Swiss-Prot record:
Cited Gene3D superfamilies: 2.40.50.100, 2.40.50.150, 3.90.1100.10, DNA-directed RNA polymerase, subunit 2, domain 6, RNA polymerase alpha subunit dimerisation domain, RNA polymerase Rpb2, domain 2
Organism (species): Lactococcus lactis subsp. cremoris (strain MG1363)
Catalytic activity: RNA(n) + a ribonucleoside 5'-triphosphate = RNA(n+1) + diphosphate
Lineage: Bacteria, Bacillati, Bacillota, Bacilli, Lactobacillales
InterPro entries: DNA-dir_RNA_pol_bsu_external_1, DNA-dir_RNA_pol_su2, DNA-dir_RNAP_su2_dom, DNA-dir_RNAP_su2_hyb_sf, RNA_pol_bsu_bac, RNA_pol_bsu_CS, RNA_pol_bsu_protrusion, RNA_pol_Rpb2_2
Identification of the protein by name: DNA-directed RNA polymerase subunit beta
One protein family per Pfam: RNA_pol_Rpb2_3
One term of GO molecular function: DNA-directed RNA polymerase activity
Role of this protein: DNA-dependent RNA polymerase catalyzes the transcription of DNA into RNA using the four ribonucleoside triphosphates as substrates.
Subunit details: The RNAP catalytic core consists of 2 alpha, 1 beta, 1 beta' and 1 omega subunit. When a sigma factor is associated with the core the holoenzyme is formed, which can initiate transcription.
Keywords from the named record: DNA-directed RNA polymerase, Nucleotidyltransferase, Transcription, Transferase
GO cellular component: DNA-directed RNA polymerase complex
Keyword Secreted: no
GO terms, biological process: DNA-templated transcription
EC number(s) stated in the UniProt entry for this protein: 2.7.7.6
Gene from which the chain derives: rpoB
Length: 1196
């Protein structure tokens, strides 16, 4: 027997065909969210306060200090926040100390700082009752970047950009004449020597001595002449810079100093962030530039005076290892003194080393570095500017490297914590202004911290971020895999990122550094391709936001691949050679072959085993979680694998899910980490189980009670339902799955079912990827899912009195009210159809003055009931089902309702959706299709033993698509079902051809795994043997019930008076320009006329036509379409006097409908201004919904 048994969780054993030992398990798959937020609460939040405080007043007599903060217990639990449409958040209290420097008086006070959103255990936030999450953002890292440019004449030159986290950019560039320029914050350029002079190096000789002679430097100095002898060179340079930054303003050297300090050297205005300083020091450090160069001076140990490395030595990795500690300790450091009128007249520490130029072995080049400033230094320093210029000049000599901006060493992840930290910082900086003003304007005696602080800017900033940021998204909750995938997603779009329209192919493309960090497969199709990506399965994010991938260290001395795992960032990995995960190893963990396939800076090379530094930990570290759930992924074309991974995320949870016979071994951990399953918080013994709760007695004796979620509506309108998995008396460990979530079975992800599939054509019904299905799948509810829709009705106070929820509704018979309770709300369990009442509601109508006759009648018969109109909530088209839950919120019960709302009723309707013709289905290999025919079981082809086939797929869907994985899954699935075993075939390390055929043979199937099929209608065998097997098929969220739609009497657009479009607006089908051409070509004049008039926007004509049909008269001639009148009005608004003439050249009156002219609806009732208002509201709502849909599509 091939393969070995592996236990996944407590409830499933699979036969695994993996051959590679994995030395490390998968990390917790949502830690990218949870760790970031935890870090924010532990450190990030306090750091922002420490950055912003203390705040002084303008006179410097008072100071407000930050002492600390405390988070109190949340007002609502997660479930309560969901039910009440509230936020899951905790009040935060910050302690401030106000110091009066004149009197020495201290006032300490705790200030309420608003409610701060809390993250749930699943990595999400509850915002207004719905579950949202913050998608991480992939952005350019702050740092120092160099690039190569080629102009149109083919001349190469180098450029440089310093990108801060916050603040002005600093750029260096060369023009066609070979002169170097500097640009400050994208303004006009200046010679770069001007910047050096401003830093205090006034004379040409000082600059040449500092940087060494190069062609670029001497040419630039020649161009940079002393224009105004009255100023020193430093002052003239300062004025030149001021003139560029503030053109037209009077310039002085002092104002320029102040401006330059504010632009680059002031921590309030300029910030590198720790990551920027780390990248900067790393780029400019001498140790990272010396490899492969020849030294032009000896390296001497400063303590002993011993010469460690002689002149003319080539710096190899071993030499570098020897001198690296000395360079870190300041070898080659020297101090230069700028002139007294410099921007910052303080000594500058630099580090230097002399080497020979690679382009001219006689030339000595001095490399300068910034002396490695401390990581606390978050601003640019003069040493940084000088060493940047030195590096830039060195590039022309062939020293140093240009940067690739798409390299993952230069792009970093901003996770939840950092994004929130930035929002708090924005809020605090707005607040700081207010505090300063209040400090200055208030009387000193009675001022308190509470009186100074207005928290609104901070709370508004956070609210805005959660409500409307591009990165705050409505969680994709189709199934647990889509939840998990959404939490691990990161986007290059959003504030501070790139825009979809400007994104080049290079940004979107797969880069070699994505290996083990970002999935090359899972990305959306369409305009966002390559801009939205997923984290690879083993990847982690380090403290600076760079993605790390794990590797096994190779002990090169002994030639052993150790089990020690190191996480490397992309730029660290560039220094090493990494062997592939499938390199054969001996029993004592040595490479079995003399040579191994390895990667080095993007090249796949065969190297001697002794030169490999690391080895991959697992073959599936390359790809993301969704792609790792596709068996035989290695046999699929990547485009189809992309579709397969994306479509698994659209699977609908079924009533009775089954895990796949052929899995990849990822199903268990995906289910556990998704947050949809119920996990044991502590080890213990199960004491009680029912459908609603599980009680576990801990080993310490305490009792844990777990509530099970039943049939809750998910964000996507699917049913979120948990089923107990633990049994009475069972021992459970911490983090064991004790209840399956939606789309789970026995603790494993179960997105679909395992039907019997045949690749064959049948009467042409599976043309173009269509799917033919057996009636059995409907009868046995194999692909039945539950959709839950939520409807709400609220009563408000109107000008004419309050609205009311009641059974007493005008003009409604008893039959329609039979399912409403005494208060007018539908009962739970009622079966409702389209148009049925859910909540009876009446709104007061404006009354006219009664006539004398009416007054007399009222006097005789008492006060008549007030005039009300029916505004009840009814079931919309296609919304019928069973009332599953009703929730009533009122002020009396202490529920928080929006202002003006007195009562809110929510009704949940559940629909059992069996699979229909028109529903979309898919396998896991991108093989998608629409159900085209549902055939009775007796007509389906059957196996020799009489078993009917469940699904027929078109064999033409395989060859051109090159997703052969589906065929391998089919054969192995049949063998697995016959043997009654579940199989795991991990990605890139799964069952080989031999394994498949051995298993097929073990199951007693035919050698070619095909079979004879018999036609169910005739009993005759089909001509050829047919591939039949078990394939995992999923039903997708694109269900025909949500899309089928037909208009009867519906709303019209207010301006053009044409029918609205779209299902949400109960709109019509657009008869567009091309369709009109078709009718014109056909000569169908009457059809064309009524389509352009009665059926569209001839307001009077359509009303008259309706009346004529009702009365059985001839339909009158159509009038003028409303849109024509709109066109005429638009032309008149341009000042063109346009008149419309009839055949006799009489001017037609395009008068507007008068108020008193009766407009009637097709049902002959009068059109009132309220109706027009309501219609206007419907149109506005429709447009808003359409915009929301478009935005949602864009997000996808």
């Amino acid at each position: 027997m091939a393969g070995h048994d592996v236990k996944y969780g407590k409830h499933r054993t699979r036969r695994s065909f993996s051959r590679i030992k994995e030395v490390i398990g998968l990390p917790n798959l949502i830690e990218v969210q949870t760790l970031s937020y935890k870090n924010f609460l532990d450190e990030g939040l306090a750091n922002v306060f420490k950055e912003m405080f203390p705040i002084d007043n303008f006179a410097g007599t008072m100071e407000l200090e930050f002492v600390g903060y405390e988070m109190k217990t949340p007002k609502y639990t997660v479930e309560e926040a969901r039910a009440h449409d509230a936020n899951y958040s905790a009040p935060i209290y910050v302690t401030f100390r106000l110091v009066n420097k004149e009197t020495g008086e201290l006032k300490t006070q705790e200030v309420f700082f608003g409610d701060f959103p809390l993250m749930t255990e699943m990595g999400t936030f509850i915002n207004n009752g719905s579950e949202r999450l913050i998608v991480s953002q992939l952005v350019r890292s702050p740092g120092s970047y160099f690039h190569l440019k080629t102009d149109k004449n083919g001349l190469e030159s180098f450029g440089h950009t310093t990108i801060p986290n916050r603040g002005a950019w600093f750029e260096l560039d060369t023009d066609a004449k070979g002169i170097g320029y500097v640009r400050i914050d994208r303004t006009r350029k200046l010679t770069f020597t001007t910047m050096l002079r401003a830093l205090g190096f006034g004379s040409d000789d000082e600059i040449l001595e500092l940087l060494g002679e190069t062609q670029l430097l001497t040419d630039t100095i020649a161009k940079d002449v002393h224009k105004n002898p009255a100023d020193t060179r430093v002052e003239e340079a300062l004025k030149d810079i001021y003139d560029r930054l503030r053109p037209g303003e009077p310039k002085t050297a002092d104002s320029s100093r102040g401006l330059l300090v504010a632009r680059f050297f002031d921590p309030k205005r300029y910030d590198f962030a720790p990551v920027g300083r780390y990248k900067f020091n790393k780029k400019l450090a001498l140790k990272n530039r010396l490899l492969g160069l020849t030294l032009a001076e000896p390296i001497v140990d400063p303590e002993t005076g011993e010469i460690l490395v002689n002149t003319d030595t080539l710096v190899t990795r071993d030499v570098l290892d020897l001198i690296e500690p000395l360079l870190d300790n300041g070898l080659g450091n020297f101090v230069v003194e700028p002139s007294d009128d410099a921007v910052i007249p303080e000594p500058i520490t630099l580090q230097s080393i002399k080497v020979y130029s690679p382009k001219d072995s006689e030339r000595v080049v001095t490399l300068l570095s910034n002396g490695n400033p401390d990581s606390e230094c978050r601003v640019l320093t003069p040493a940084d500017v000088i060493s940047n210029i030195s590096y830039w000049l060195g590039l022309a000599e062939g020293i140093g490297k240009v940067d690739d901006i798409d390299h993952l060493g230069n792009r970093r992840i901003r996770s939840v914590g950092e994004l929130l930290q930035n929002q708090v910082r924005i809020g605090l900086s707005r607040m700081e202004r207010v505090i300063r003003e209040r400090m200055s304007s208030s009387e000193n005696e009675n001022i308190t911290p509470q009186g100074l602080i207005n928290i609104r800017p901070v709370t508004a900033s956070i609210k805005e971020f959660f409500g409307s940021s591009q990165l705050s998204q409505f969680m994709d909750q189709h199934n647990p895999l889509s939840e998990l995938s959404h939490k691990r997603r990161f986007s290059a779009l959003g504030p501070g990122g790139i825009s979809r329209d400007r994104a080049s192919y290079e940004v979107r493309d797969v880069h070699y550094t994505h290996y083990g960090r970002m999935c090359p497969i899972e990305t959306p199709e369409g305009p966002n391709i390559g801009l939205i990506n997923n984290l690879s399965s083993y990847a982690k994010v380090n403290e600076y936001g760079f993605i790390m991938s794990p590797y096994r260290r190779v002990d090169r001395v002994n030639g052993i691949v150790t089990d020690e795992v190191e996480y490397l960032t992309a730029d660290e990995e560039d220094n090493y050679t990494v062997a592939q995960a499938n390199s054969p190893l001996t029993d004592d963990s040595r490479f079995a072959n003399e040579t191994v396939m390895a990667r080095h800076t993007g090249n796949n090379i065969e190297v001697e085993a002794s030169t490999a530094d690391y080895m991959d930990v697992s073959p599936k570290q390359v790809i993301a979680v969704a792609a790792a759930c596709i068996p035989f992924l290695e046999n699929d074309d990547s485009n189809r694998a992309l579709m397969g991974a994306n479509m698994q995320r659209q699977a609908v949870p079924l009533i009775d899910p089954h895990a796949p016979w052929i899995g990849t071994g990822m199903e268990h951990q995906t289910a556990r980490d998704s947050g949809a399953a119920l996990l044991a918080k502590h080890a213990g013994v199960v004491e009680y189980v029912d459908g609603n709760e599980i009680r576990v007695r801990r080993t310490s004796g305490e009792l844990d009670i777990y509530n099970i979620t039943k049939y809750r509506r998910s964000n996507s309108g699917t049913s979120y339902n948990q089923r107990p998995l633990a049994r009475l008396g069972e021992k459970v460990e911490k983090n064991d799955i004790i209840a399956d979530g939606p789309s789970m079975e026995n603790g494993e992800m179960a997105l679909g079912q395992n039907p019997l599939v045949a690749y064959m054509t049948w009467e042409g019904y599976n043309f173009e990827d269509a799917v033919i299905m057996s009636e059995r799948l409907i009868k046995d509810d194999v692909y039945t899912s539950i959709a839950i829709e939520e409807y709400e009705s609220e009563t408000r106070d109107t000008k004419l009195g309050p609205e009311e929820i009641t059974r007493e509704i005008p003009n409604v018979g008893d039959e329609a009210l039979k399912n409403l309770d005494e208060s007018g709300i539908i009962r739970i369990g009622a079966e409702v159809k389209d148009g049925d009442l859910l909540v009876g509601k009446v709104t007061p109508k404006g009354e006219t003055d009664p006539t004398p006759e009416e007054r007399l009648l009222r006097a005789i018969f008492g006060e008549k009931a007030r005039e009300v109109r029916d505004t009840s909530l009814r079931v919309p088209h296609g919304g019928g089902g069973i009332v599953h839950d009703v929730r009533v919120f009122t002020r009396e019960n202490g529920d928080e309702l929006p202002s003006g709302v007195n009562k809110l009723v929510r009704v949940f309707i559940a629909q059992k959706r069996k699979i229909h013709v028109g529903d979309k289905m898919a396998g896991r290999h991108g093989n998608k299709g629409v159900v085209s025919n549902i055939v009775p079981v007796e007509d389906m082809p059957y196996l020799p033993d009489g078993t009917p086939i469940d699904i027929m797929l078109n064999p033409l869907g395989v060859p051109s698509r090159m997703n052969i994985g589906q065929v391998m899954e089919l054969h192995l699935g049949m063998a697995a079902r016959t043997l009654g075993i579940h199989i795991a075939t991990p990605v890139f390390d799964g069952a080989s051809d031999e394994d498949i055929w051995d298993t097929v043979k073990e199951a007693g199937m035919a050698a070619d795994a095909k079979t004879v099929l018999y036609d169910g209608r005739t009993g005759e065998p089909f001509d050829n043997r047919i591939s039949v097997g078990v394939m995992y098929m999923i039903k997708l969220h694109h269900m025909v019930d949500d899309k089928l739609h037909a208009r009867s009497v519906g709303p019209y657009s207010l301006v053009t008076q044409q029918p609205l479009g779209g299902k949400a607006q109960f709109g019509g089908q657009r008869f567009g320009e091309m369709e009109v051409w078709a009718l014109e070509a056909y000569g169908a004049a009457n059809v064309l006329q009524e389509i352009l008039t009665y059926k569209s926007d001839d307001v009077i004509g359509r009303t008259r036509a309706y009346e004529a049909i009702v009365k059985g008269e001839r339909i009158p001639k159509p009038g003028l379409p409303e849109s024509f009148r709109v066109l005429v009005k638009e032309l008149q608004s341009l000042g063109l006097d346009m008149k419309v003439l009839d055949a006799d050249r009489n001017v037609l009156d395009l008068r507007e409908l008068d108020e008193d002219e009766v407009m009637t609806r097709p049902d002959n009732t009068e059109i009132t201004p309220e109706m027009l208002e309501a219609q206007e509201a419907i149109v506005a709502q429709a447009e808003a919904e359409e915009e929301a849909l478009i935005n949602a599509d864009i997000e996808k």
